Amino acid sequence: MKTKKLGNSDIETSEIGLGCMTMTGIYGPADENESIATIHAAIDNGVSFIDTADAYGGGSNEILVGKAIADRRDKVVLATKFGNIYAKDSERGADGRPEYVREACEASLKR
């Protein structure tokens, strides 16, 4: 698997990443064991860039990814996103306030 430096940092990651959005039922039912096996297979085959977001399943995707990489954390560059807000009435919005950024990052780290 080809790798490259992430921006100007010393972090090196695979050129191919694994997006995990659909692993928590965004487009229909998802099997947790199958999703974890998929993440493990990707890592075993050299994929080190794993992508998730707090909006995927209301944080459940981050929990799933965390469970999958728990014993492989040193092999993974983990990316998450935040800022998408979903209200109870299905209204969408965005929040980029500094206090929300901190809150979202802390919540993602806990998951």
Predicted regions and their residues:
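Generic beta-strand or strand-like secondary-structure segments
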Residues: 64-68, 81, 100-107
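A short acidic, helix-capping loop that chelates divalent metal ions and anchors anionic groups
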Residues: 22-27, 85-91
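Conserved catalytic core of Hanks-type protein kinase domains
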Residues: 42, 81, 111
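N-terminal binding-site loop/beta-alpha segment at the start of enzyme catalytic domains
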Residues: 1-77
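A short, structured active-site edge motif that brings together acidic residues
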Residues: 75-87
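Glycine/proline-rich, positively charged
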Residues: 88-111
